[in-house]
C-alpha cells in the first residue's frame, strides 16, 4: 500500500471500512433489493446477466456474485468498479465519509501531494466546476446566460445542473488551480489543461459548460457548447478527452439526478443533449439522461439495466427520445440492431414536427414533454414503420419490396413469441392477406440467421482455449448442504456458531473446497476468536491457500441464510451444526460397527465389550443430535 511519500496505516484502513456502509457504496452503481436476513441482491455490475446473482451482506461488509465469482469487501468493490488501485480506493472512500487519512513516513506538507491520482483528479475537477460556475456570473459570460435564458432555463436551473462558463484568456483556469496547489501534470491528466506553444493553457475557452458527473455526484469531466462565431474551434460541442476518470462509454449526463427515480419507477428516458436533459427534468420527466460525446451504447444500457432491476425479474422501460430527422431514425435503427437485452421493453418518442425536447418545451411548455413520453411507440414498431414509409404500399411492387426489407429485420428479434406477433402486424401494415406466409418467412429467416450465428460462435470458441475449470462445490448438492450451511453460519455469525462450530473437525467437511475453508477458519483462530464482521471474513481469506478457497470464502460469507427473521437464527444455526455433527457421528458409528464385526467377543472379550459400550454411547449421542437437528426452522 505504499504511495510516493508514505503509507496508509492499517488503523485508518480499518476505521474507514467501519464507517462506510457497503450497501450505500454499491447502491450508487446497482439497484439492491432485500433478499433475506442481512442480505441484498441485484444485477451484477461486473458481467451481463438477466437474473440477479450479485449479493451484498451489509453486516459483514462483503459482496459476492454467484454468476462470475467476483467478491470481496468494499475496497475490492471500488477497485473493480472504478478501475483504481487499493490506495486510491481507500482515499476515495475516505473522502466519501469525511475521514482524514494520515500517512506514515511522510511529512505533513507532502500528504496531499502523495494522495492517489484519482482523488487528486476528482479534486481538480471539483475546483474547476466551482471556478466555471462563478465565471458564469461575470460580465463576459452574458452570452452564455442569454443562451440559457432563451431556452427558458433560469438561474436555479443553471445551478441545479452546475452550468458554468470558460472565460477567454490563455490560462485563467490553469493559473487558478495551480495557485490552489495542483500540479500541471494533474490538470493535464484530468483533461482541464494542455501544453500549448506558449506553455500550459486551458482546454476550454469562451464556452458554456456542463459538468459531467458520475452517479455519486462527483465531477469527472465537462461538456462545452460553442457560443461565438469567431471561435476557431468549429465543433458545436466538445468534451473532456478520455482520462483516468472520464470514459465516455461509461457515463451518462444527468444520472446523478435521475438514478433514484429510474430505480423507483423502473423507467429511463434517453435524450440526445445537455439542454434536452435539463428540459426533461424541469418538465417533470426526472428519469432523463444523455450520453456524452458518443452514441448511446451497450455499457450505457448495462448501467440503466442495473438501476431498473426489480427483484427476480426485469420490468423496466427504456424510452429513446430522438429528433425526427434522418439522424434520429438512424439512431433508432442502431438501437434495434444492437444487443436486445432490453429491446422488448424499449420505446421511441419523437415529436410530430421533429423538434428536440428543449425546443418542444420552449414552444409548447412542460406538458408537451410529458405527453411526448406518454405517447411512446415500441422500438420494434417504430423501426418497422420507418422502413415501410420508404416504400409505395399502394403498388404490388412496393408491398413486395417492403416485405423483402422488413422480414430480415423482424428475424433479428430474439423473442420468438414477440417475433411472430410483429410478423402478424407486418402483414397487416403491408396489406398482405396471407398472414401465415409472412410468419413462415420470418421464422425461416430467423433460423437461418441463428445457424450462422451458432457456427460463428462455435468457430470463436474453438479458436480460444478454455480456461481450466474452477473447482468449487455444487451449492445445490443436497449431500453437502449441512456442510455449506455450517460454514455460512461460522463465517456470517461466528458469535452464534461459537464453540460448537470449533469442535467440528476438518474431516467433517468431505468436499475439498469446504475442507479448505474450515482449515482457514481454524487457522484464523476459530469462531471463538472474538473477531466479527468484515474483519473476520478478511482474516479467514488471508488464511486460505488458493484463490479458489478465497473465492469460496467470499461466496459463503454473502450467500443468504434462509431464515425469516433474525430471532430464529440461533435455533437454525444450532440445528445446522447438530445435523453436521450427526452425520460425522454416524460415520464414526459405522466404523465402530465394522470393527466389532471383525472382532471375536470370545477371544477379545474385554476389548469387544468396551468398544460395544462406546457404540451404545455414540448411538445415544446421535439420537440427541437428531432431535436437536429436527427443529422447525431446518429444511434441507
From Swiss-Prot:
Binds 1 zinc ion per monomer. Binds two Mg(2+) per subunit. One of its GO terms (molecular function) is zinc ion binding. It catalyses: ssDNA + n NTP = ssDNA/pppN(pN)n-1 hybrid + (n-1) diphosphate. Disulfide bonds: none annotated. Residues 443-481 are annotated as: Disordered. Its EC number is 2.7.7.101. Mg(2+) 2 binds at residues 323, 325. Residues 266-352 form the Toprim domain. InterPro entries: DNA_primase_core_N_sf, DNA_primase_DnaB-bd, DNA_primase_DnaG, DNA_primase_DnaG_DnaB-bd_dom, DNA_primase_Znf_CHC2, DnaG_bac, DNAG_N, DnaG_primase. It holds the Pfam family DnaG_DnaB_bind. Keywords: DNA replication, DNA-binding, DNA-directed RNA polymerase, Magnesium, Metal-binding, Nucleotidyltransferase, Primosome, Transcription, Transferase, Zinc, Zinc-finger. Residues 443-459 have a biased composition (Basic and acidic residues). One of its GO terms (biological process) is DNA replication, synthesis of primer. RNA polymerase that catalyzes the synthesis of short RNA molecules used as primers for DNA polymerase during DNA replication. Monomer. Interacts with DnaB. PANTHER family: DNA PRIMASE (PTHR30313:SF2). Contains an N-terminal zinc-binding domain, a central core domain that contains the primase activity, and a C-terminal DnaB-binding domain. Belongs to the DnaG primase family. This is DNA primase. The gene is dnaG.
Amino acid at each position: 500500500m505504499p504511495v510516493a511519500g508514505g503509507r496508509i496505516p492499517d488503523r485508518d484502513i480499518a476505521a474507514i471500512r467501519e464507517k462506510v456502509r457497503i450497501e450505500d457504496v454499491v447502491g450508487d452503481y446497482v439497484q439492491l433489493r432485500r433478499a433475506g436476513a442481512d442480505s441484498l441482491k441485484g444485477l451484477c455490475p461486473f458481467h451481463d446477466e438477466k437474473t440477479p446473482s450479485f449479493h451484498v451482506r451489509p453486516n459483514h461488509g462483503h459482496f459476492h456474485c454467484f454468476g462470475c465469482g467476483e467478491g470481496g469487501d468494499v475496497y475490492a468493490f471500488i477497485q473493480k468498479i472504478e478501475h483504481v488501485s487499493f490506495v486510491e480506493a481507500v482515499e476515495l472512500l475516505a473522502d466519501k465519509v469525511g475521514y482524514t487519512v494520515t500517512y506514515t513516513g511522510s511529512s505533513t506538507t507532502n500528504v496531499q501531494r502523495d494522495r492517489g491520482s484519482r482523488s487528486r483528479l476528482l479534486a481538480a475537477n471539483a475546483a474547476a466546476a466551482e471556478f466555471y460556475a462563478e465565471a458564469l456570473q461575470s460580465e463576459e459570460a452574458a452570452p452564455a446566460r442569454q443562451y440559457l435564458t432563451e431556452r427558458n432555463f433560469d438561474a436555479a436551473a443553471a445551478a441545479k445542473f452546475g452550468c458554468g462558463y470558460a472565460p477567454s484568456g490563455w490560462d485563467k483556469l490553469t493559473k487558478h488551480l495551480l495557485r490552489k496547489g495542483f500540479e500541471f501534470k494533474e490538470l493535464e491528466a484530468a483533461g482541464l489543461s494542455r501544453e500549448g506553444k506558449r506553455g500550459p493553457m486551458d482546454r476550454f475557452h469562451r464556452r458554456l459548460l456542463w459538468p459531467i458527473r458520475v452517479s455519486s455526484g462527483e465531477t469527472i469531466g465537462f461538456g462545452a457548447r460553442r457560443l461565438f462565431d469567431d471561435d476557431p474551434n468549429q465543433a458545436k460541442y466538445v468534451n473532456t478527452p478520455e482520462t483516468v476518470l472520464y470514459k465516455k462509454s461509461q457515463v451518462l449526463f444527468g444520472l446523478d439526478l435521475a438514478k433514484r427515480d429510474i430505480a423507483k419507477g423502473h423507467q429511463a428516458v434517453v435524450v440526445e443533449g445537455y439542454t434536452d436533459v435539463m428540459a426533461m427534468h424541469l418538465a417533470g420527466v426526472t428519469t432523463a439522461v444523455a450520453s456524452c460525446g458518443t452514441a448511446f451504447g451497450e455499457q450505457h444500457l448495462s448501467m440503466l439495466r442495473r438501476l431498473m432491476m426489480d427483484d427476480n425479474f426485469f420490468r423496466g422501460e427504456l424510452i429513446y427520445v430522438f429528433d425526427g430527422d434522418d439522424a434520429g431514425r438512424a439512431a433508432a435503427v442502431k438501437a434495434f440492431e444492437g444487443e436486445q437485452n432490453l429491446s422488448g421493453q424499449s420505446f421511441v418518442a419523437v415529436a410530430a414536427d421533429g423538434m428536440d425536447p428543449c425546443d418542444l418545451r420552449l414552444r409548447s411548455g412542460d406538458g408537451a414533454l410529458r405527453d411526448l413520453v406518454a405517447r411512446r411507440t415500441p422500438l420494434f414498431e417504430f423501426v418497422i414503420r420507418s422502413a415501410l414509409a420508404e416504400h409505395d404500399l399502394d403498388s404490388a411492387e412496393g408491398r413486395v419490396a417492403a416485405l423483402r426489407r422488413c422480414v430480415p429485420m423482424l428475424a433479428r428479434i430474439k423473442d420468438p413469441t414477440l417475433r411472430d406477433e410483429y410478423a402478424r402486424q407486418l402483414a397487416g401494415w403491408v396489406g398482405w392477406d396471407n398472414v401465415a406466409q409472412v410468419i413462415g418467412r420470418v421464422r425461416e429467416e430467423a433460423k437461418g440467421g441463428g445457424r450462422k450465428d451458432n457456427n460463428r460462435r462455435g468457430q470463436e470458441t474453438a479458436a480460444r482455449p478454455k480456461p481450466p475449470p474452477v473447482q468449487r462445490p455444487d451449492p445445490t448438492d443436497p449431500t453437502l448442504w449441512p456442510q455449506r450451511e455450517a460454514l455460512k453460519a461460522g463465517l456470517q455469525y461466528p458469535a452464534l456458531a461459537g464453540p460448537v462450530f470449533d469442535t467440528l473437525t476438518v474431516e467433517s467437511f468431505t468436499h475439498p473446497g469446504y475442507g479448505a475453508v474450515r482449515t482457514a477458519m481454524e487457522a484464523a483462530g476459530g469462531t471463538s476468536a472474538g473477531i466479527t464482521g468484515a474483519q473476520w471474513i478478511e482474516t479467514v481469506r488471508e488464511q486460505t491457500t488458493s484463490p479458489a478457497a478465497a473465492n469460496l470464502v467470499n461466496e459463503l460469507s454473502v450467500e443468504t441464510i434462509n431464515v425469516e427473521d433474525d430471532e430464529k437464527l440461533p435455533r437454525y444455526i444450532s440445528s445446522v451444526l447438530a445435523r453436521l455433527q450427526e452425520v460425522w457421528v454416524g460415520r464414526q458409528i459405522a466404523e465402530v460397527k465394522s470393527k466389532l464385526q471383525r472382532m471375536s467377543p470370545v477371544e477379545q472379550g474385554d476389548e469387544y465389550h468396551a468398544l460395544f459400550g462406546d457404540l451404545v454411547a455414540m448411538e445415544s449421542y446421535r439420537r440427541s443430535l437428531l432431535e436437536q437437528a429436527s427443529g422447525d426452522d431446518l429444511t434441507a
